[in-house]
UniProtKB/Swiss-Prot annotation, chains A, B:
InterPro entries: ACO, ACOX_C_alpha1, Acyl-CoA_Oxase/DH_mid-dom, Acyl-CoA_Oxase/DH_mid-dom_sf, Acyl-CoA_oxidase, Acyl-CoA_oxidase_C, AcylCo_DH-like_C, AcylCoA_DH/oxidase_NM_dom_sf. GO terms for molecular function: acyl-CoA oxidase activity; FAD binding; fatty acid binding. GO terms for biological process: fatty acid beta-oxidation; fatty acid beta-oxidation using acyl-CoA oxidase; long-chain fatty acid metabolic process. Homodimer. It comes from Arabidopsis thaliana (Mouse-ear cress). This is Acyl-coenzyme A oxidase 2, peroxisomal. Its EC number is 1.3.3.6. It is found in: Peroxisome. Binds 1 FAD per subunit. One of its GO terms (cellular component) is peroxisome. Catalyzes the desaturation of long-chain acyl-CoAs to 2-trans-enoyl-CoAs. Active on substrates longer than C14 and mostly with C18-CoA. Activity on long-chain mono-unsaturated substrates is double than with the corresponding saturated substrates. Residues 1-49 form a transit peptide. Induction: Induced by dehydration and abscisic acid (ABA).
């Protein structure tokens, strides 16, 4: 409830109880909702909201042109292909086993029939790869993830962690799906803490082989996509154990990646020593066959070590260009950041679909109304605007932020610039976790905002929520990823004080730290005019101020607590604070990108619509955290009140262009699919679906 | 993110950047999460959280004795019955059609084999009825709802809206499931706004019959439970149309309820004139067969009018003990409040199961740890405590509040006391909406808190969330119900000013209004000692202050806006504010009940544990709304900070008795069922489930 909480109404005008009371009884009359003793019809007249202010006339074409991705052609090709193949569309109800087969067939259809070959783009044109992923994800999210497992995880591990010999041997088979494969990192006992993995790969110099073993049940590889049914290979992450000539006899070289064949190329039988079980029914993504793998002395040739960052020679000597176990492991994991970029990007895609369905239906749906007048659209209720309009604004905000992330990632893949690598790493961790957490909550809000009809499976919220849910966990758990963002900020904070340079995205910290460490300006704290509150400078300053102060304070707290609690204890004592810092930072980055996008929009009316959304995004976030701002007198009480009023007003304004803003996502009916959100005759399409 | 937001850290000690920075780098080293370049092993030592303070020794038996419901015997009988009948247990994966058949068989088994007869308790012993509902709901939520449709909705409408002739004719058949039935109120176009229903029941004096008609597609009865497959009858809500002798020819007497046979008693064929379609696959509750009904001149005898509140004589004359259409409709709907009480109560049951699974697993699961020390339980992370401990405290809070609601409801059913009717009506609307919204969000938090293993269907969060989701919507949409609570408060506010009496639950408004309308006390606003913050008087005062102020202010705002916008417009302009008021009020009622429950607990150690939870509930809510309190200087900046610190500390304290608090719910493993939450050998039970 806190998000709707009126944090400030107490400063609202004082009441004259008696007069009010009389009127109140009459007011409450208009409300005659379900299952309640219902008073008589109201007598009071009303003016409906939508008549309240002049509506902005948005050039929809210009807006969608501005929003449109570069790779719309391949996306449309994908939509057309699946549209032409009803046999490849996922029905509303399907068993797990059938769903898995269908999903595999969808992938085969995409690659072998539609001729879309995602693998080549994984390395060479990531923007295109992500566009493909977004499109197939909206066909069925399971397909998006299945494709990601095959090309980005299994394929990606081979080309990014292996060397030329691996590429030569596996590229074509992975590309054309002859070599289906898995990415086997997680174990039953270790997910987030990958350094704790226990599977071993022991070098046997006699036979020139590695022996893969699962030392105990906790080390069973778990959740491995493609393992339960379709995979022929797995990239297995295991501790490399080398024989030594000292008393210990062996040496643990840390976690490395190995290609392990798990099923016979011809018979598809599980290979000897490999035990595969099915992880079973999941909350969602049941088109993906996640399995659990146990290895009993499975032998693989030495060549199957993915040896880009570390190699073992014929005689068992270890070589690497990188000095330490941790550097090597870091480099290994660093190559996999693309998965996270993809999830952030795909999550915005889900948010777009969900917001579109909820908003289109809320425009159509009417319920209650002023006495003796037609019922009103539920989107005219202030509460419905509160549920959906900041969400619509946020969708735009995240759109621009993730497009930027994808660009940066592509650039990084080309230049391998070190600064950029660090930047993309933290940005992808932050955006992935922030956006997926938001979308997960938004999906529930959308379902609820559509009432009973939102609960029909055909209207999509259920499967979208169930499929998307795990975006918060895989490719790095959100709570863990945010800590990486916080750690990165602290590192840069330190650099700043040592006079180092700060990278592009974060540079505001450098510029602003000094300003923000001083007390808030008591004069501007009182400015409450709309022009001021809608000034990007005020908004950005407020976000940056908050981040800078959070950073400075947590640094001090960490320092204090580490004296008594040690590093681990101090970090834990400040953990909520650190997570807040990370989120605050990400919100700041998102706002900066949104402001830039508004500025660069060439069409004036489109720009005006974006500006409304951007202001709503900014002020809604400030209002949500008004306690922080009030507590240090960054805003005075009346300014807080003005921010709240303006937020409600902007929600109402955005409602007036909601249709245009949603249309600009250019999601055709065959992508949104929910009958209640069809662009024409929604009700009759809905009744048809159930058989009338 | 707002809930974790550090609203106050800026007042934390100022930093010495340089020293801090050096330490920070070391601190950040301990963090080596998945898929990221991971730094070297940390060197700093740590003290784990759980060693920080002395643990309270809770007498678990005393605590569970205090928590235990009166009707544990019948609940155990139900559990035992289903335990002994594996054929009646719902498998993880099941098709919609099979699920519906199974669900019907579960109900038949319960009634005819286990001999549990819920129908007699609907009217005579509601507490027992709700206990049965809770127990069957934890077997399968679909069964709980299916049972509710049969006995509380269909059966309840017959006995509560009908008269002796209906009871005599239908009681036994409903009781023994020969007369399966539906409650057909909602239409495609009208859910919350039931006064807008369009189905008609026209009296035909020639044949002494009513003719039921669906005038247009928007009037198709929709979402009707039991209609798609099993129902033989439906209580249909339709506008009663009577012939008149004036020029209009007919008169619309408003919505009434009629018993309409929809399927043949022998052949089970749909009867002539009735068209039934299947609403299809839903987000959850797929064991319930919701259908859509269209009527084409379906004739029923005059006796089928449920005539308790209004009757039609042989010659078409209308009689009623109640004066107006609205009074009659109100009385009709008022009889159905039990469904809402049941949902609030059942929702707490779901929350208990979900919190139990998440907390038991969080105690077991270990991930990361201080350097060279064993990994720690994830419940030792401050962030995990933040996710789950206020939730555990809230579960206790809602437990006591809904137990109270059920008691009041039973009393009301016995006494029919008018004051109590009004009280129960508002309280059930408020608690139903507040608790179900909370539980819906909590289920997502629990899934996420359990990481990947929380996503295995077998661990329950998916089905619990999907099934529970609609609790927010049916039996009255939450956003609509909260408005009823607000309207009720405004009504009482008015009564107060007219010198009327306030009923029990709300009486604090009477007592406190005068105090709270004055300015906050600048002295107590600065008190920040733990004793003060944990004093129930401070906590209740803070909650009541907020509610009183919100009420007073919204009354004034409504008065102001109604001048220009009319009643409907003014209400809408203040809608967010009104919803906040309603929530604030409900939170206050919940806190008062919790404080009372702590006070009355006979065992000192159990009492101490409850006190921890109660303080956490109270302070967490105050902190969530700290902006409001700060803005009117109800709390000074340092007090705000103290509240935040104490909240984190209490989360940690509650964590230390989390096992005991969860155990006291007395949910046996065969009820929680999630392998990851088994009370012993959870991991090995989990591996067994997937086939190892
Ligand atoms: C559908 C699905 C598909 C998957 N596919 C693959 C795959 O193909 N290959 C593969 O290798 N893996 C795969 N995974 C595994 C996935 O990567 C892991 O689930 C993920 O890394 C999280 O690890 P975990 O589940 O062990 O959670 P844990 O690490 O056990 O986390 C559990 C909880 O503890 C909290 N927590 C943990 N550490 C900390 C900390 N330091 N501070 C605060 N809180 C903490 C987390 O926030 C989380 O809420 C898949 C998982 C699923 C569910
Ligand atoms: C699984 C299931 C089982 C059901 N079983 C039955 C049954 O057996 N019998 C039966 O008769 N019905 C049944 N229903 C219908 C149920 O009672 C309705 O769905 C419910 O009353 C809500 O109505 P609605 O769906 O039309 O939502 P709407 O009233 O259309 O509401 C849609 C949205 O608009 C918002 N809204 C509406 N009015 C206002 C307002 N005044 N102010 C602010 N916001 C507003 C709501 O908050 C909601 O978010 C069932 C529904 C489902 C999904």
């Amino acid at each position: 409830m806190e998000s709707r909480r009126e944090k400030n109404p107490m400063t609202e005008e004082e009441s004259d109880g008696l007069i009010a009371a009389r009127r109140i009884q009459r007011l409450s009359l208009h409300l005659s909702p379900s299952l309640t003793p219902s008073p008589s019809l109201p007598l009071v007249q009303t003016e409906t909201c939508s008549a309240r202010s002049k509506k902005l006339d948005v050039n929809g074409e210009a807006l969608s042109l501005y929003m449109r991705g570069k790779h719309i052609d391949i996306q449309e090709k994908i939509f057309d292909f699946f549209n032409s193949r009803p046999d490849l569309q996922t029905p509303i109800e399907i068993s797990k086993d059938d769903h898995r087969e269908l999903c595999m067939n969808q992938l085969i259809g995409l690659v072998r029939e539609a001729g879309v070959r995602p693998f080549r783009y994984v390395a060479d044109d990531p923007e295109k790869y992500f566009a493909i992923m977004e499109a197939v994800g909206s066909v069925d999210m399971s397909l998006g993830i299945k494709m990601g497992v095959q090309y980005s995880l299994w394929g990606g591990s081979v080309i990014n962690l292996g060397t030329k010999k691996h590429r030569d041997k596996y590229f074509d088979g992975i590309d054309n799906l002859d070599y289906t494969g898995c990415f086997a990192m997680t174990e039953l006992h270790h997910g987030s803490n990958v350094q704790g993995l226990q599977t071993t790969a022991t070098f046997d110099p006699l036979k020139d082989e590695f022996v893969i073993d699962t030392p105990n049940d906790g080390a069973i590889k778990w959740w491995i996509g493609n393992a339960a049914v379709h995979g022929k290979f797995a990239t297995v992450f295991a501790r490399l154990i080398l024989p030594t000539h000292d008393s210990k006899g062996v040496s643990d070289m840390g976690v490395h990646a190995f290609i392990v064949p798990i099923r016979d190329m011809k018979t598809h039988q599980t290979l000897p020593g490999v035990e595969i079980q099915d992880c079973g029914h999941k909350v969602g993504l049941n088109g993906v066959d996640n399995g659990a793998l146990r290895f009993r002395s499975v032998r693989i040739p030495r060549d199957n070590l993915l040896n880009r960052f570390g190699d073992v020679s014929r005689d068992g000597t270890y070589t690497s260009s990188l000095p330490t176990i941790n550097k090597r492991f870091g480099a290994t994991l660093g190559e996999l950041v693309g998965g996270r970029v993809g999830l952030a990007y795909a999550s915005v895609g889900v948010l777009k679909i969900s917001a579109t369905i909820a908003i289109r239906y809320s425009l159509l749906r009417q319920q209650f109304g002023p006495p003796k007048q037609p019922e009103v659209s539920i989107l005219d209720y202030q509460s419905q605007q509160h549920k959906l309009m900041p969400m619509l604004a946020s969708t735009y905000a995240y759109h621009f932020a993730t497009v930027y992330l994808v660009e940066k990632y592509s650039e990084m893949k080309k230049t391998h610039d070190e600064q950029l690598v660090a930047d993309v790493h933290a940005l992808s961790a932050g955006l992935k976790s922030y956006v997926t957490s938001y979308t997960a909550k938004a999906l529930s809000v959308c379902r609820e905002a559509c009432g009973g009809h939102g609960y029909a499976a055909v209207n999509r919220f259920g499967s979208l929520r169930n499929d998307h849910d795990i975006f918060q966990t895989f490719e790095g758990d959100n709570t863990v990823l945010l800590q990486q963002v916080a750690a990165d900020l602290l590192k840069r904070y330190k650099e700043k004080f040592q006079g180092g340079t700060l990278t592009v995205t974060w540079s505001y910290l450098r510029e602003s730290m000094n300003t923000y460490l001083s007390q808030p300006n008591p004069v501007t704290a009182r400015w409450e005019g709309e022009d001021h509150l809608r000034d990007p400078k005020f908004q950005l300053d407020a976000f940056r101020y908050r981040t800078s102060r959070l950073l400075q304070n947590v640094a001090a707290r960490l320092q204090k607590h580490s004296k008594t609690l040690g590093g681990f204890g101090a970090w834990n004592r400040c953990l909520n604070h650190l997570l807040t810092l990370a989120e605050s930072h990400i919100e700041t980055v998102i706002l900066a990108k949104f402001i830039e996008a508004v500025k660069n929009c060439p069409d004036p009316s489109a720009k005006a619509a974006l500006k409304l959304a951007c202001d709503l995004y900014a002020l809604d976030r400030i209002w949500k955290d008004i306690g922080t701002y009030r507590n240090v007198d960054y805003v005075a009480p009346n300014k807080a009140k003005a921010i709240h009023k303006l937020t409600e007003y902007l929600s109402f304004q955005v409602r007036n262009v909601a249709k245009e803003l949603v249309d600009a996502f250019e999601l055709p009916d065959h992508v949104t699919r929910a009958p209640i959100a069809m662009q024409s005759d929604a009700y009759s399409q809905y009744t048809q679906v159930v058989g009338f």
